[in-house]
Amino acid sequence: MIQALTLARPYARAAFAIACEKGKCMQWSQALTFSAQVANNPIVATLLSHPQLDHEQAAALLSPEGADPAYIRFLEVIAEAHRLDVLLQVAGLYEKLRAEAQHVIKAKITSAIELAPNELNNIVTALKKRFDCEIEVTTGVDHSLIGGAVIDTGNVVIDGSIKSKLTRLQASLTH
């Protein structure tokens, strides 16, 4: 995995530089996500490793419809270097670069029940205030939390779940 990240890093940086230069950071983000998902499909991965598939065909297979010509050329370069296997890591690193440049934090909010829109807005507002940047939120439900929520921003985890409070209470009672 570390080697894959090492191999992917220069491609992610190059993609980010090209996309920003063209003012298409978000379009490239979506295109990379699409291409990485397609390349990760086992059937497509087998096809991509076929010796008769040239790099232009591989890029065409992985490109979303209406992709920027520079993006297609970028995929051709990766295919020519036989590095399509690290496309998922390229997409992940690209997203980190985009988030840093645009001062965006991705937060995963997991709650015991589905959050009402106003509750979600209150949490997002509090996160924006705490981190002083924009927040991209994904939500999930985990009934084992019993109540409350867990917010994971990658670097910071805020655990306000009843499950964790009970676990801490149990630990303090047994020691």
From Swiss-Prot:
UniProt KW keywords: ATP synthesis, Cell inner membrane, Cell membrane, CF(1), Hydrogen ion transport, Ion transport, Membrane, Transport
Record function comment: F(1)F(0) ATP synthase produces ATP from ADP in the presence of a proton or sodium gradient. F-type ATPases consist of two structural domains, F(1) containing the extramembraneous catalytic core and F(0) containing the membrane proton channel, linked together by a central stalk and a peripheral stalk. During catalysis, ATP synthesis in the catalytic domain of F(1) is coupled via a rotary mechanism of the central stalk subunits to proton translocation. This protein is part of the stalk that links CF(0) to CF(1). It either transmits conformational changes from CF(0) to CF(1) or is implicated in proton conduction.
Protein name per UniProt: ATP synthase subunit delta
TM annotation in the entry: none
Keyword Ion transport listed: yes
Main location: membrane
SUBUNIT field: F-type ATPases have 2 components, F(1) - the catalytic core - and F(0) - the membrane proton channel. F(1) has five subunits: alpha(3), beta(3), gamma(1), delta(1), epsilon(1). F(0) has three main subunits: a(1), b(2) and c(10-14). The alpha and beta chains form an alternating ring which encloses part of the gamma chain. F(1) is attached to F(0) by a central stalk formed by the gamma and epsilon chains, while a peripheral stalk is formed by the delta and b chains.
A GO molecular-function annotation: proton-transporting ATP synthase activity, rotational mechanism
Superkingdom, taxonomy of origin: Bacteria
Membrane topology category: Peripheral membrane protein
Keyword Metal-binding: no
Subcellular location: Cell inner membrane
Assigned GO CC terms: plasma membrane; proton-transporting ATP synthase complex
Coiled coil segments of this chain: none
Protein family (similarity comment): Belongs to the ATPase delta chain family.
